[in-house]
């Protein structure tokens, strides 16, 4: 690649204004969206009393070239730390001031966890956004329906499905630069490519997809003359579906996901210590699933069953012993969620279900060997949700779950969620109070610092807000305030005198509160404005890498066969902490606020056959930090082409 690559990107954006004069055939987005996250069954968003952000297939298409982390980072109340860093940088999911352990991630109704992880958290880097059809982000404590970890929110991902045509497919290639603020290379060092084959007929559907990503050209750590790190990902997915009649259907799937990356050390006050040529990681995941569904006169019955294995091999430099140490982890998970919706009337239905989950892990490293004969537990959680949708405008969602854990016993969580739609006003008022739990991980129970006496963390969230549709439903505004409390968090104890260390349950209460506002305005059938603002205030102990203020603004111009989008983001200053090797103590620092501007242009050169897009990220080449001591991306260019057949 040479300077022609940059020129093509800029030229494509410039030509958008000439194409924009073509006649428009797109209609205003249907504001009566269907959501599934708050009941596990489809219902009108108007009848939902929860704060659910929906990212549709169309909106994902308008964000071509962005990663899953980039897309989620633009949602009100969601902070994905590391999304602007090098592609292999580990990610932090901070919803409403929470942490990774407090976010539940589901794909097609099946929970994703790494049973060998410190907090049972899942690595979002394993997921390719090119496999995704739709994302729902439901904020607030949601353990009643989603179990452990659903304390601050649920990221509910739906993968692409087979179309009704007998056969079709697509193939794509995307080339991008990989620059920091200090570099301006035009060489393509971020390469994405893949294909998809799918179709349906004679009651059978199928899908095969392969996606890959290779990134290099940046050091993960910030410093002069540091070696370049690398990141690669491969995703393979196979789906089969069968629908013998209108009432019964099922789907089976299998996936293989792999990431390989090199990484650097955390900042310790000495910049030269950050760069490390020996640190490397390999993560491999295999998932299988079975999803039957049966519809009858008064309801539906479904099972979401899946199993996964995640293996991680980590190589790190041991500066104390001057050796290279190897760490091997394997985590296995089995999940089966059987649930039934029964409608008593058109206004009243109940969801009854039971979720079973099994976890085990193996750990082999220089400090410990942990066998899955010991490191294992299971959960059996029956739950119920009652939903009442009155014709007078009152909606009520009541639910409860009994968490039964093989180690620590039982725990009850619940939710109360009323909402009211005014008949003569364009206004819906929502309120909720819900609780959640986070089970201790296998590592925290049985690892080298394990403590089998740990009890689950408890969370509770109270919300109050409204949604209004004005100007003939062209303008939608929703605002919600929240107050969140967490108790019995799991922490790490270290005795400097005896060098004894282990995990403990911290008795105490930490809180977070805030405000989230989202606005969508359809100026015309062609032009849409979307914006959001988030205010988050947390207790001092929680205040790391959490911006107090954050805002996003996006403008989309749709025209015949194309789309032009501009995105602006403001992220307030944040507090970061690090262990300073110079003074042997923890230090605190402030990271400055930053602003980003991105643009994307896409166009169908051949209708339903050939699409092209170009994107420029960090247009102003803003210098900023997400985490102290780590690089972030400067101005970069992407150019992509998709073939449809």
Which residues does each predicted region cover?
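Outer-membrane beta-barrel signature, preferentially recognizing the C-terminal barrel domain
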Residues: 273-291, 417, 427-428, 432-487, ...
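Extracytoplasmic beta-strand/coil segments of soluble accessory domains associated
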Residues: 69, 73-111
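N-terminal periplasmic accessory domains that precede
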Residues: 33, 68-71, 91-94, 106, ...
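Repeated loop/turn-to-beta-strand initiation elements of outer-membrane beta-barrel proteins
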Residues: 203-207, 247-250, 298-302, 347-350, ...
């Amino acid at each position: 690649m040479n300077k022609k690559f940059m020129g093509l990107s800029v030229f494509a954006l410039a030509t958008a204004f000439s194409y924009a004069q073509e006649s428009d055939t797109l209609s205003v987005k249907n504001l009566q969206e269907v959501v599934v996250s708050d009941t596990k069954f489809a219902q009108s968003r108007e009848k939902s009393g929860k704060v659910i952000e929906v990212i549709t297939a169309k909106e994902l298409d308008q964000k071509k070239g962005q990663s899953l982390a980039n897309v989620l980072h633009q949602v009100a109340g969601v902070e994905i730390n590391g999304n602007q860093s090098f592609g292999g940088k580990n990610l932090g999911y901070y919803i409403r001031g929470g942490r990774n352990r407090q976010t539940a991630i589901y794909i097609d109704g099946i929970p994703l966890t790494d049973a060998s992880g410190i907090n049972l958290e899942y690595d979002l880097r394993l997921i390719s956004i090119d496999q995704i059809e739709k994302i729902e982000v439901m904020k607030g404590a949601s353990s009643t329906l989603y179990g452990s970890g659903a304390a601050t929110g649920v990221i509910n991902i739906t993968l692409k499905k087979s179309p009704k045509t007998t056969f079709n497919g697509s193939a794509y290639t995307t080339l991008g630069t990989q620059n920091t603020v200090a570099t301006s290379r035009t060489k393509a060092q971020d390469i994405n490519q893949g294909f998809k084959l799918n179709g349906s007929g004679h009651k059978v559907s199928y899908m095969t997809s392969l996606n890959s990503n290779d990134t290099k050209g940046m050091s993960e750590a910030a410093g002069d003359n540091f070696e370049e790190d690398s990141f690669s990902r491969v995703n393979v997915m196979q789906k089969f579906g069968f629908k013998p009649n209108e009432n019964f259907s099922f789907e089976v799937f299998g996936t293989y996901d792999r990431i390989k990356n090199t990484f650097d050390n955390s900042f310790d006050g000495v910049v030269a210590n950050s760069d490390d040529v020996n640190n490397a990681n390999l993560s491999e995941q295999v998932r299988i699933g079975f999803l039957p569904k049966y519809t009858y006169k008064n309801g539906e019955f479904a099972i979401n069953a899946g199993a996964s294995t995640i293996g991680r091999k980590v190589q790190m430099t041991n500066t104390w012993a001057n050796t290279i140490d190897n760490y091997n982890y394997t985590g296995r998970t089995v999940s089966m969620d059987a649930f039934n919706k029964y409608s008593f009337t058109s206004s009243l239905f109940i969801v009854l279900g039971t979720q079973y989950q099994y976890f085990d892990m193996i750990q082999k490293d220089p400090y410990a060997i942990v066998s899955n004969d010991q490191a294992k537990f299971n959960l059996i959680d029956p739950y119920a949700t009652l939903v009442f949708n009155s014709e007078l405008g009152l909606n009520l969602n009541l639910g409860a779950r009994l968490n039964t854990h093989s180690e620590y016993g039982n725990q009850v969580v619940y939710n109360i969620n009323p909402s009211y739609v005014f008949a003569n006003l364009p206004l819906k008022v929502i309120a909720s109070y819900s609780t959640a739990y986070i089970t201790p991980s296998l590592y925290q129970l049985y690892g080298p610092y394990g403590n089998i006496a740990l009890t689950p963390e408890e969370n509770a969230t109270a919300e109050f807000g409204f949604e209004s549709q004005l100007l003939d439903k062209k303008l939608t505004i929703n605002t919600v305030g929240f107050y969140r409390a967490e108790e019995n968090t799991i922490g790490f104890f270290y005795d400097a005198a005896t060098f004894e260390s282990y995990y403990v349950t911290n008795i105490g209460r930490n809180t977070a509160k805030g405000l989230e506002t989202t606005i969508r305005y359809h100026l015309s059938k062609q032009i849409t404005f979307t914006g959001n603002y988030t205010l988050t205030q947390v207790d001092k102990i929680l205040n790391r890498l959490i911006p107090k203020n954050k805002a996003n603004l996006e403008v989309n111009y749709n025209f015949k066969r194309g789309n032009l989008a501009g995105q602006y983001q403001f992220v307030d200053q944040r507090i970061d902490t690090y262990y300073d090797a110079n003074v042997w103590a923890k230090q605190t620092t402030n990271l400055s606020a930053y602003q980003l501007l991105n643009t994307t242009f896409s166009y169908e050169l051949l209708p339903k056959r050939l699409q092209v897009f170009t994107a420029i990220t960090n247009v102003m080449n803003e210098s900023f930090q997400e985490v102290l001591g780590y690089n972030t991306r400067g101005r970069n260019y992407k150019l992509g082409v998709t073939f449809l057949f």
